[in-house]
Amino acid sequence: MLKKIKISLILALGLTSLQAFGQENPDVKIEKLKDNLYVYTTYNTFNGTKYAANAVYLVTDKGVVVIDCPWGEDKFKSFTDEIYKKHGKKVIMNIATHSHDDRAGGLEYFGKIGAKTYSTKMTDSILAKENKPRAQYTFDNNKSFKVGKSEFQVYYPGKGHTADNVVVWFPKEKVLVGGCIIKSADSKDLGYIGEAYVNDWTQSVHNIQQKFSGAQYVVAGHDDWKDQRSIQHTLDLINEYQQKQKASN
């Protein structure tokens, strides 16, 4: 009986801790993926429907590298506060994987808190045309980064969700951050394609498959990222869309 009471107390305390975390950060969910790499998920509404946006951050011996940003500027400060609370380190670098607000919307904020901000030259050009905040530093489509003892690579596979979408590869962890060019395995369609290049998308995904065939985890840009069938599902969705387009012509 005493043993059962102890177990009940432990479970109750665990649930209380989880609830407290949720109350402090109702719009930001952080999950450890592998080693010092974490997936963070934020939520926003598009056309009346609530969606999750996924990205990652890497804890290095020099500080924290954030890929993309929380979806919505109202979440920026609580996100960086939570990072400091969890790891005792500040964000020192931010990289946007394309020009949309759920990826590049935090460039100004991260710059203001002292982080170095980066994007490709293609993304920078789009942001400039749209009169939006831009990164402090730009690079050509492919670039390798080394921060302290940690390394990762930015790779441009070709056009897809947008003209400028890139992916990020963490070789030690064997994790690929697909961003919005990779659809979640539970996606019903290609989502927003107002700036997409659907006819190029398939080849771009094949380029990703070939270059990062050793990936153990692929983090899709939206919704469920844990189902690792996301790359194949993306190809299926593209094909489905193209077949419907042919049938309607």
From Swiss-Prot:
Gene Ontology biological process: antibiotic catabolic process; response to antibiotic
GO terms, molecular function: beta-lactamase activity; zinc ion binding
Positions of Zn(2+) 2 binding: D102, C180, H222
EC numbers, comma separated: 3.5.2.6
Gene3D superfamilies: Ribonuclease Z/Hydroxyacylglutathione hydrolase-like
Superkingdom field: Bacteria
Subcellular location field: Periplasm
Residues that bind substrate: K183
Cofactor: how and how many bound: Binds 2 Zn(2+) ions per subunit.
Keywords carried by this UniProt record: Antibiotic resistance, Hydrolase, Metal-binding, Periplasm, Signal, Zinc
Family: Belongs to the metallo-beta-lactamase superfamily. Class-B beta-lactamase family.
PANTHER family reported in the protein's UniProt record: ACYL-COENZYME A THIOESTERASE MBLAC2, METALLO-BETA-LACTAMASE DOMAIN-CONTAINING
Protein name: Metallo-beta-lactamase type 2
Originating species: Elizabethkingia meningoseptica (Chryseobacterium meningosepticum)
